[in-house]
């Protein structure tokens, strides 16, 4: 028993002027919003990642590599000082 779902065919949607008017505005706005989200630094604040100039401090220039598997808390405290 086959039938139709009552939805518009995709070809009708893509060829309509209304579709292109709406999407010619919304798609570029998504790219602009993403660019602003990253370029203003809000992405770093929202996800808690360090900014590129905060990975290394003036006192610590080496990579924070953990060596001891079972003494991680102690090593993390040393790296954070």
Swiss-Prot record:
Q: Does the keyword Coiled coil apply?
A: no
**Could you describe the subunit structure of this protein?**
Heterodimer of an alpha subunit and a beta subunit. PSII is composed of 1 copy each of membrane proteins PsbA, PsbB, PsbC, PsbD, PsbE, PsbF, PsbH, PsbI, PsbJ, PsbK, PsbL, PsbM, PsbT, PsbX, PsbY, PsbZ, Psb30/Ycf12, peripheral proteins PsbO, CyanoQ (PsbQ), PsbU, PsbV and a large number of cofactors. It forms dimeric complexes.
Family listed:
Belongs to the PsbE/PsbF family.
Q: Which Pfam families match?
A: Cytochrom_B559, Cytochrom_B559a
Binding-site residues, heme: 18, 23
> What is the recorded membrane topology of this protein?
Single-pass membrane protein
Q: Which GO terms describe its biological process?
A: photosynthetic electron transport chain
Q: How is the cofactor bound?
A: With its partner (PsbF) binds heme. PSII binds additional chlorophylls, carotenoids and specific lipids.
Q: Does the keyword Heme apply?
A: yes
Which cofactor does the UniProt annotation name?
heme b
At the top level, the lineage of the source is Bacteria
- Protein's job: This b-type cytochrome is tightly associated with the reaction center of photosystem II (PSII). PSII is a light-driven water:plastoquinone oxidoreductase that uses light energy to abstract electrons from H(2)O, generating O(2) and a proton gradient subsequently used for ATP formation. It consists of a core antenna complex that captures photons, and an electron transfer chain that converts photonic excitation into a charge separation.
Q: What is this protein called?
A: Cytochrome b559 subunit alpha
Q: Which residues cross the membrane?
A: 19-40
Q: Name one GO cellular component term.
A: photosystem II reaction center
| Recorded GO MF terms | electron transfer activity; heme binding; iron ion binding
What keywords does the record list, in alphabetical order?
Electron transport, Heme, Iron, Membrane, Metal-binding, Photosynthesis, Photosystem II, Thylakoid, Transmembrane, Transmembrane helix, Transport
**Coiled-coil ranges per UniProt:** none
Main location per UniProt? membrane
Subcellular localization is given as: Cellular thylakoid membrane
* Protein source organism: Synechocystis sp. (strain ATCC 27184 / PCC 6803 / Kazusa)
């Amino acid at each position: 028993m086959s039938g139709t779902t009552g939805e518009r065919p995709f070809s009708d949607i893509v060829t309509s002027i209304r579709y292109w008017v709406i999407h010619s505005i919304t798609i570029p706005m998504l790219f602009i919003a993403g660019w602003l989200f990253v370029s203003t630094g809000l992405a770093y604040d929202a996800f808690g990642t360090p900014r590129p100039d905060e990975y290394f401090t003036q006192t610590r220039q080496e990579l924070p590599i953990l060596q001891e598997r079972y003494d991680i808390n102690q090593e993390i405290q040393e790296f954070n000082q």
